[in-house]
Regions:
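Juxtadomain low-complexity/linker regions and immediately adjacent membrane-anchoring helices
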Residues: 1-68, 85, 93-121, 143-236
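A short glycine/threonine-centered beta-strand motif
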Residues: 78-80
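Beta-rich interaction modules in large eukaryotic scaffold/regulatory proteins
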Residues: 113-141
Length: 238
């Protein structure tokens, strides 16, 4: 299975619940739908503006360097629950201020837990991506082998730094309790539908057609390459 072909569960109206720090750049940037960008001459009161989530440098008493366990973290709520198959950590444009390493944990929670509940010691997390090294200005894909259904992801970075985007690819598994008594769109991605096959996705994926968000630009629709006789039609199967 190509995990990158699976839907991004975080992009389906996901949100950012909490973070240990966001001194240099806001945690919400992690889930922006646009590709990361960088403007070299753009500064604010805190320095160079980065399109991502960036924490301050961690220091111990007297300015000592952090030990190997020091970390920052961010918790995101998936737009729809699902079985996570891969996580992608993108450090685009973070070249001297990227984290040395990362790991990821997952949780399955009912309802809408508060940030305080998600960060409480009693809240249970399962490691799904062991600690792994990162490099700057690069996309890092980590395969996830757990077959469990999750609602929240916690990304840990060691010891601090910046991440441009977070992607969580997997299979949508909606909560039946949220659909009970409702008339739902059975062809909607957020209700568990998906693209079974397609003739072509040269320019963009047919999954855009069943995604919940309205298209902002042409690239957020489905477009195939030009066809000539004898084959003159494209198709997708939901």
């Amino acid at each position: 299975m190509d995990e990158q072909w699976l839907p991004d569960l975080l992009r389906l109206r996901g949100s950012v619940a909490a973070a240990s720090d966001e001194f240099y750049a806001a945690k919400e940037n992690l889930i922006k739908p646009d590709a990361p960008s960088f403007v070299p001459e753009m500064y604010d009161a805190k320095g160079q503006v980065y399109d991502g989530w960036e924490t301050r440098r961690r220091r111990g008493p007297g300015g000592t360097l952090p030990d190997d366990t020091a970390r920052d973290w961010v918790i995101v709520r998936l737009g729809v629950p699902g079985v996570v198959r891969s996580i992608e950590v993108d450090t685009a444009f973070f070249t001297g201020n990227y984290p040395q390493a990362c790991s990821a944990d997952a949780s399955s929670a009912s309802g809408y837990p508060t940030p305080e509940e998600l960060t409480a010691e009693a809240h249970r997390w399962q490691e799904i991506v062991p600690r792994a090294l990162l490099t700057g200005d690069a996309r890092h894909a980590f395969k996830v082998n757990s077959g469990r259904r999750f609602t929240h992801i916690r990304l840990n970075i060691f010891p601090d730094g910046g991440v441009a985007r977070l992607h969580v690819h997997g299979e949508v598994v909606p909560d039946p309790a949220m659909l009970e008594g409702l008339t739902v769109d059975l062809a909607a991605l957020e209700n568990g539908a998906d693209i079974a096959a397609r003739s072509d996705q040269f320019y963009s994926s047919p999954r855009h057609v069943i995604s919940p968000e309205l298209s902002r630009v042409m690239g957020e629709g489905w477009e195939t390459r030009r066809r000539r006789r004898p084959v003159t039609s494209g198709w997708s199967s939901v």
